[in-house]
């Protein structure tokens, strides 16, 4: 069974206007000194069919009046008991508080609902075991500045003064602007810089700006927080680093208002690949070509991304004035990406870089560079010859051509393309060391001997003649005669003398006849 009272209390409908007070009391729908009360919709009630209140506002009013019957009714209508307790605290109706005390698990949960500081404190006092610090923490969370003002002297007391920093951090984290300002104006904050870290993490520009107001306007003026120019600069640089790292351009610009360095911001942006920051500052701060080149060196040194390098190069139209310094950073940091970008824009610094590498670096660096840029063996060898780097030529040639005969064959081709005599002789010397270190087939040695004759390599040819003499066959005789013919054509007397000497040996040994010798020299005289 159900009663008419239950039906009326649990449902939403309008009451008839002719219901008398006694009837309403029997139905449990009468509020002393207010009149009839019924549920108008889910979250509202109507008093005397005219005044509309939210259920929770009505609960707070009932709590102030200590009307437990109305409180029970409104709780049936899904009201929040906390509002009734708040009303009771405000009016100090402790009987109602005692009645519902056991239903409150944590008195701190009521604090955000309270607007009045006195009621706020009364409520907090009901949390057994809490101290002044706990009250101040919740005052900050609930933006109750007046409570902090009330306990200012306590905060300055040595017993709790060390807690100022944690309260300041809490105010920053909960973004209580008025409280932050008040703390900055009235209390000695041990580490006011915390506000900047929190502002950057939460991306709160207003909080970031407020930090400077506290440090430079309030604390420094009052002598609480002294900053020398050096410390001020360090502080601003740190803030720039944080802001750029997060890509927060407005924060970077804010530091400039207090003396932050544009160059510092650009350097950080380059290292962190923050292109939006770079682009804005370059376009709005009148950055010189020289400064951009310095940023480019930094980008190379720190291995910045392709997009960052491209952006910096675009500002100077891909034309670097101080190539030497750029190459210093490229090779010093083993960072060659910029060379590839310039090469794509028809700016070739690869040869210059390779020359520097060959001259000053190790075999491994040179090999890596050659492979990275697909440099032809001929180009590398010519540079190495110019720099007189015989060891590195030998080692890299061994990597390229494992077969010594093939190695000699390619090197001979390169010798023919070198235009200056000293370079040709240098490479011929290397070829000869390869010959000395390996056992070549006779036909390869014969070809090498002919090559030496063509380039008038007297000493090396003389060395090979020993092999030719030891192989006293018809093949050897033919090569001696061919060498004589070439030496005669090119007028190399030293070579001719060596060949003549070995022809005499062959004649003495019976390998060559008098007629063959006469025929060879007859050809010589005919040419003369």
From Swiss-Prot:
Disulfide bonds: none annotated. It is found in: Host cytoplasm. Keywords: Early protein, Host cytoplasm. One of its GO terms (cellular component) is host cell cytoplasm. Plays a role in virus cell tropism, and may be required for efficient virus replication in macrophages. Interferes with host NF-kappa-B promoter activity mediated by TLR8. Mechanistically, inhibits the phosphorylation and subsequent nuclear translocation of host NF-kappa-B RELA subunit downstream of TLR8. Promotes the expression of the autophagy-related protein host ULK1 to degrade host STING and inhibit the interferon response. Also inhibits JAK1- and JAK2-mediated signaling and thus negatively regulates the IFN-gamma signaling. Interacts with host STING1. Interacts with host JAK1; this interaction leads to JAK1 degradation. Interacts with host JAK2; this interaction leads to JAK2 degradation. Interacts with host RELA; this interaction inhibits NF-kappa-B promoter activity. This is Protein MGF 505-7R.
